[in-house]
Structures are given as C-alpha cells and as structure tokens.
C-alpha cells in the first residue's frame, strides 16, 4: 500500500506532501505490525503445516497433460466462471466482486500457461493480456485497502487523497471491464473449440517434426 500511495502522489502533484507523509508513516507502522505477526513462531508453524499438507496432496495428484479431454473440462469450467463474473461486473462494483474477477482471470491465465509448449502466438498474447488485467485489478485491490485506512480520517488532505483514489480506481475498473469483455467474448463451448483446434494444429506439426527428426547415430535402421 505504501508504494501505491507514492504512485498516487506522483500522478497528483496538487496533493500536499505533508499530509501524505503522515499517512505514509501510518501505513509503514501497520505494515511492520503485520510483518511481526507473520514472523511470530505460531504463525510460522501454521504456514509450514499448511504448506506441508498441500505438498503431500499435490504429490498424490498425477495428471496426464496429454489427456486433452481432462484439460478441456477444467478450462471450460474456469472460463465459464470468469465470463459470468466479468459480465456481471458493473460500474461502481463492490470490492468483493472486483476481487472475484481478479481471481477468475488469474485462474484462466495459469491454466493457459499450462498449455505450453503447445501454446500458439494467440494464446501467448491472451496470457499477456490476462496478466495486465490481473495487474490492474491487483492495483485496484491495493487502493481499496488504502482507502479503508483513510476512511475514518476527516481532514482536508485525506479527503483529497480519497478522491484521487476514487478516480484511479474508476479508471482501473473501466479498463478491466473492457478487457474482460474482449477476453471472455466467446461462449465457453466456442472458446474450447477454438483452443482444441489450435491444440490439434500443434499436434500435427509436432508429430511431423518428430518423424522428420534425424535418427540418433548408431540407432538400428
């Protein structure tokens, strides 16, 4: 949040630095307190316990990445959830709705990344667009937290800060809505058909290259 505050000041030169510095000091104190809580032995033990349990669970999971039907089923569900959330994202949406959209976009981004090396140029571009979208929504989330810190402070300087936050969040959310409409334009079934065609094209090229690869020296004729 401290970095977001500095970025906000950089974009809004008319904000008084004296008021901003007082807010920055409060944020640094809160951040330090949070770090101390995370560093406490009980917190570390809990993190290690959860991480260990998750690792044990993942080691039991074996997914055949060549099983397109299995991958397609998961991708379709992830895409459908994201499409529904972004289509419902309206101007002035509540923080929870924006956060759920960000989570859905990240799920799709990671899922598409798992398709490498078969990912086409278009899929890679989609991943980059999703990355920018999640960055925008991540900044919006940080600004929402910053705004909640300022909410109970009533002097003029903090009021100006909150107005600047509101303007920036409106811009970020507007950009996210437009990006979401483009990225989730297709219906889920059409989107999976689109991915399947690209996957099939990649498989044809891959198999041809494998057939044309020179045999290793000493291999049986």
Please annotate each region the language model reported:
Residues 1-221:
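Function-determining surface determinants
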């Amino acid at each position: 949040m401290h970095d977001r505050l500095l970025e906000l000041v950089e974009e809004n030169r008319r904000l008084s630095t004296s008021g901003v510095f007082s807010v920055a000091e409060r944020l640094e104190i809160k951040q330090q307190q949070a770090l101390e809580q995370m560093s406490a032995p009980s917190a570390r033990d809990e993190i290690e316990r959860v991480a260990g349990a998750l690792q044990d669970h993942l080691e039991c999971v074996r997914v055949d990445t060549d099983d397109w039907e299995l991958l397609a089923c998961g991708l379709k569900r992830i895409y459908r959830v994201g499409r529904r959330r972004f289509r419902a994202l309206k101007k002035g949406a509540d923080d929870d709705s924006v956060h759920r959209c960000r989570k859905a976009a990240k799920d799709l981004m990671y899922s598409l990344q798992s398709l490498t090396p078969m990912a086409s140029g278009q899929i890679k571009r989609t991943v980059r667009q999703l990355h920018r979208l999640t960055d925008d929504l991540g900044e919006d989330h940080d600004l929402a937290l910053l705004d909640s810190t300022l909410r109970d402070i009533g002097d003029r300087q903090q009021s100006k800060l909150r107005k600047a936050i509101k303007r920036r969040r409106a811009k970020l959310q507007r950009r996210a809505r437009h990006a979401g409409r483009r990225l989730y334009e297709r219906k889920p079934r059409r989107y999976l058909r689109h991915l399947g065609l690209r996957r099939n094209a990649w498989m044809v090229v891959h198999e041809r290259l494998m057939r044309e690869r020179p045999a290793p020296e000493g291999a049986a004729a």
